[in-house]
Amino acid sequence: MKKLQKQRRSDFLLLIVAAIILIGAILVSLAMQNGMNTAGEKNVSMWLTTPDPANRLTQQAPIPWRIDDSNEAAASADTLTVEIRPNIRYQTMEGFGAAVSGSSAYLMNHGMSANQRDQLLNDLFTAGGIQLSYIRHTIGASDYSVDEQGQPSSYTYDDVATGKDYELNHFSIAKDRDVIDVLKQILRRNQDLRIMGTPWTAPPWMKYGEQIYNGWYLDYTDPRVYQAYADYFVRYIQAFANEGVPIQAISIQNEPEFTTSKYPSMSMGAVEQAKFIKQYLGPALSRNDLSTHIIAFDHNWDTGSEYAKTVLGDEQARSYTHGTAFHCYQGEPTAMTDVHDAFPDKPVYMTECSGGAWSPGFGDDLSWDMSKLIIGAPRNWSQNVLFWNIALDPSGGPTNGGCTNCRGVVTIDPLSGAVTKNVEYYAIGHASKFVRPGAVRIDSTHYSGSIETVAYRNPDGTLVLIAANTGENTKTFKVRQGNQVFKSTLPSKSAATFQWEPTTS
């Protein structure tokens, strides 16, 4: 009898132990599902894009943190280690996005059904999509502007048949109705959206030669023209505000060192731009209590450093100028660091870059976009990253005399309204979906031509690491914060975003 009681007691204890083990396993499993590892630390969330279509900003299994074992570290000395140093801080980010050109707005408003447009805007601007947070648009016509029938159209906000209009009596934003409508739809999804406006040209009657094309500069023989152009910017900002579209920033001239006879353009040298800012535009914004930022240059990396230094080197112009903008088509992003180092209190911005049919393929495109723009621009102090057209049709249009093989962030088929998300969508999404406006760039180890990185601390405290393997072979690497590490492997020409709560060590 006693033996039977002992046996039952032993069996009961075994059942209790088994139950405890089972409960512990369940708790561990639940913790893992909820982003916790067995040490009580949050796991790392990961999203991956590769040349394989199966991975397009696709969430991966959570990655656990581990204590960094010195013996293991010595044994794997050949493994790249990315150090995250949250206490070393750089610039504050304003956002990531693209441009709503006239062509983009036309396709969204006239090439899709209302349901298709809603889905696209949700994919672009809400938390369920990639949460773009910064938009550039053209003040008047550009190389991507069309009329109500989708035909090429060149115009400004103050066109007159003959003579001058110094009082801007013919000022009207009516021809940008599609753009305004799309911006309103975006703002309903993201009220914190930042919007930047850029003209391709002044009204022809203000220009020497009075042509919308050919890049003729402002008529310097008539001082009234400079004042009228400053007032033109004021009227534009006020008119868009009256439509419920606030303008946070303006650049003075798109690509001021490039002119063409194919679409609206205008030359503006650095000395002339400084003069216009300090004598006319800056005072005009101030008189009208407008806080819109003035951004200088807005052209390529290769010549931007000297142009920006000329404008910012003028003390009066500098007092009105918020920062400098750059494009990607020539030069290297290090030009932005050059300007930052010369004027560290003046932000730099990456405001235009277009993909296109000239590119070799998805993997190479992704690798370049990540290296030069998504990672390279912020590592060189840019406070935003913007692609060019947010949407184009399958032929790279509709165009107004510009590039015939450029590509939008998405492609809209106007015959069906179907949307194709291009490599630019996934590249910008690796940042915009996770790095919120107000995030601060923090220090991270960077291996050029291999595992390239940029890291941030969001306003809510979460940490984000964006990494790209720009090399030709698969790479395994460790990420270390304090005495904790996690390990990851990236195929060649791939990108990943990692997000986690700060570690407690």
Language-model regions: role of each:
Residues M1-K3:
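Short, low-complexity, Lys/Arg-enriched N-terminal segments of secretory-pathway carbohydrate enzymes
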Residues M32, M36-G40:
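Acidic, histidine-bearing metal-coordination/catalytic regions of metal-dependent phosphoesterases
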Residues R8, L27, S492-K493:
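Intrinsically disordered, low-complexity segments
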Residues R56-I247, Q279:
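N-terminal catalytic cores of secreted or lumenal carbohydrate-active enzymes
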Residues Q5-A18:
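N-terminal Sec-pathway targeting helices
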Residues I21-A31:
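Hydrophobic alpha-helical membrane-insertion segments, chiefly the h-region
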Residues G40-D69, A73-V82, I195-G197, D231-A249, ...:
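Substrate-binding and catalytic surfaces of secreted/luminal carbohydrate-active proteins
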